[in-house]
A protein has these predicted regions:
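Membrane-interface extramembranous regions
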Residues: 1-135
């Protein structure tokens, strides 16, 4: 059960990292790197001519979907929800996370995309899907 709780915690922590896109950025320092979590600069929405208000609304929807999907998966891992919710929860959370991270891409966000891809792969592997989750 400890492994299941740790994995559920990981899923929730990964989901909640996306809140950094709407949280205030820390103060910039002279030699510090730029804050990678920003909804003000999107290569995708800028090219499509989407305004900043709509861009932020789309980002909020993707953040909420990411948190919701990974929360369902975490509750499924702990046994609070049926195990059949595991794969759809991961798929919903990871796909919306990837969409957010690509739309507002910064090189540091590549790690998050990698995590999402691994979670999708793991959730659809026969050994860990459905009722046979062995985490």
């Amino acid at each position: 059960m400890l492994v299941r709780l740790a994995f559920a915690g990981f899923l929730l922590a990964h989901a909640l990292m996306h809140v950094a896109f709407v949280a205030p950025a820390p103060p910039a320092t002279a030699d510090g790197p730029a804050w990678p979590f920003s909804t003000s600069e999107s290569w995708l929405f800028t090219r499509l001519g989407v305004g900043p208000e709509t861009t932020r609304l789309v980002a909020l929807a993707l953040i909420a979907t990411t948190i919701g999907g990974f929360s369902l998966a975490a509750l499924s891992v702990t046994g609070a929800l049926p195990t059949g919710i595991w794969a759809p929860g991961i798929a919903i959370g990871a796909v919306s996370s990837i969409a957010l991270l690509i739309a507002f891409f910064h090189p540091w966000l590549a790690l998050g995309i990698g995590i999402d891809l691994i979670l999708i792969w793991a959730s659809w592997s026969p050994a860990v899907s459905g009722p046979q989750i062995q985490v």
